[in-house]
Amino acid sequence: MFCRSPLVAVILLVLATHIVLALGDATRIAASETVPSDSSQTTRKSTRRTTSVDNKRRLRQQIMGKDGPVVNDVHAEERGFLNNKLAYKMFGDGLDMQEKIIKSGGKGLKNVLRKRLYNKVSRAEHRQVPATRH
């Protein structure tokens, strides 16, 4: 008799587990048959893993004090960050920048644009493949 008591205990435990799981499934099925309200459908939020790119973007947005780009384009955001950094190095903060551009007549900005255009042209020349000799 004593040998069978652990076996009976295991059988009862398994039976109780199956009953609890069956009741859980039944309540979940009954809950899914009810029609959800419109507000619950609109407030659902998609969940995805937060990556290091998201963390960098959030940190950059906090530093720059902006809400961020409308388009979820990491490279465009990085270009904007570098352009803002370059403008800050040249002119200072936003108020100083406007005054310095007005005083210089836009010469500093023209020089920056001229250098960028020159760099693009020189890169394009290096990309050209020389003609092969026969």
Swiss-Prot record:
Main location: secreted
Keywords: Host nucleus, Secreted, Signal, Virulence
Residue ranges, compositional bias (Low complexity): 37-52
Induction remark: Expression is up-regulated at the earlier infection stages.
Keyword Isomerase assigned: no
Membrane-crossing segments per the record: none
GO cellular component, one term: host cell nucleus
Annotated motif RxLR-dEER, positions: 57-79
UniProt-recorded name of the protein: Secreted RxLR effector protein 1
Organism from which the protein derives: Plasmopara viticola (Downy mildew of grapevine)
Record gene name: RxLR1
